[in-house]
Structure formats: C-alpha cells, structure tokens
Design a protein with these regions (language model features):
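Conserved, well-folded catalytic cores of nucleic-acid-processing
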Residues: 20-24, 52-55, 77, 81, ...
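Short, flexible, glycine/charge-rich loop motifs used to bind or transfer phosphoryl groups or to couple energy/partner
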Residues: 35-39, 127-128, 174
Length: 202
C-alpha cells in the first residue's frame, strides 16, 4: 500500500521503483513510497549503498544527482519518522567507504569502476555493529559490477560485459547477506536486460 506517516518503513522496492521510473527519480517524494504491511513494528537498521562510479554520469545523463536525492529522502524519512531506527551510508566505486550523512550532499562521481561486492561486504559489517531486530540493505546503482578487491588487495577491473569472476564473487556476497537475514532492495537505474537479470539474483 502507499506509505503513510507512522507506517513502519518496510519498503516494497519494485513497486516504489515503478513509480520512480514513471515520475523520474528527481521528483520522487514520500507519497511515491510503497510499503509491505507488517504485523508488528520492530527496530530496523539500514545501510544505503550508493554507486558513485563514472557510469552514473556517462553519455550526458546525470543519474547520480537523482540517486543522491533518493538517499537523502530515505535518510530524512527514517531519521524523522523512525527515531529508533538506524541508517548509515556507504559509497562504492573501486572500493567502498562509509560516509557521514552531512557529507553526502557534497559527494561527486569519480573516474571509478563499480565494486559492488566491496559495498555489500562493508554494509554487512556495519549492520553487525548496528544491531536492531531487523536489517536491510538499500542498493542504488545504474550498472553492472566491474571491479573486485582480490585477496592480495589489488583491485581487479573489467568494464566489458559481465565478468564471470566479478559476478560470481558479488553474488556470493549477496548470498551471505541473505543467509544473515539481510534483504537487499535494489534501485536499478539502468534498463539493460542483462543488468536487470543480474539484479534479480541479488
């Protein structure tokens, strides 16, 4: 159902995303959020993963600014309506890093690849520290994973197609999250069939 003030924030991401794509992310408001009905209210810990790789501004299309607005809107919603809940933010690019909410509006896209695995791994680590009865990851991205941190610490990159190694390691990280009871809700800003198929596996 549509979200109303006071409802627990159990986002139905696919339905919310349909509204966002129809209106444009830059015009997304709380009225466009769709939630799943919950039988009880429990404390929720959320990590928002924001893709700041170069593809977010490729071909003259700025997808990063609207993506930041979505992240900031979620932060405002959680902090004002659910003071008992916790939310933290992670930027992922060649690697991944936590960023304070106050610095989020200033973040810019860089000449980076997309290390989705590193983002998911850091999100899992943060959620373990945050506690809470329920946990979730909200992933905002526009493209395929194209980077991977190897055991040696070296960053392996491949921007061409879906690299089998990068894909396998990213999906492995998503599987670990699910085993820990952490759903991954993805705002996918691209429409290519192979990328949509990848997201369905997360």
């Amino acid at each position: 159902k549509p979200w109303e003030w006071g409802d627990p924030l159990e986002l139905n991401v696919p339905e919310t995303l349909k509204k966002a794509m129809a209106k444009g992310l830059e015009r997304l408001s709380h009225e466009d959020l769709v939630i799943d009905l919950a039988e009880y209210t429990a404390s929720m810990s959320t990590v928002v993963l924001l893709d700041c790789s170069h593809s977010m501004i490729l071909y003259g299309e700025d997808r990063f600014t609207p993506a930041k607005r979505v992240a900031l809107a979620l932060a405002h919603l959680i902090r004002t309506q659910y003071p008992g809940d916790r939310v933290r933010f992670v930027l992922f690019h060649d690697t991944a890093e936590e960023i304070p909410l106050a610095k989020l509006p200033l973040v810019q896209v860089g000449p980076y690849h997309t290390n989705t695995k590193a983002g998911l791994e850091l999100a899992r680590t943060l959620l373990k520290k945050m506690g809470g009865e329920m946990k979730q990851i909200i992933l905002i991205t526009d493209g395929k994973p194209s980077a991977l941190t190897l055991p040696s610490g070296e960053i392996y990159k491949n921007a061409w197609g879906l690299d089998p190694l990068i894909l396998a390691e990213t999906l492995k990280e998503a599987t670990l999250a699910r085993r820990e009871g952490i759903p991954i809700h993805t705002f996918m800003l691209a429409r290519e069939p192979e990328l949509l198929a990848f997201v369905k596996k997360l």
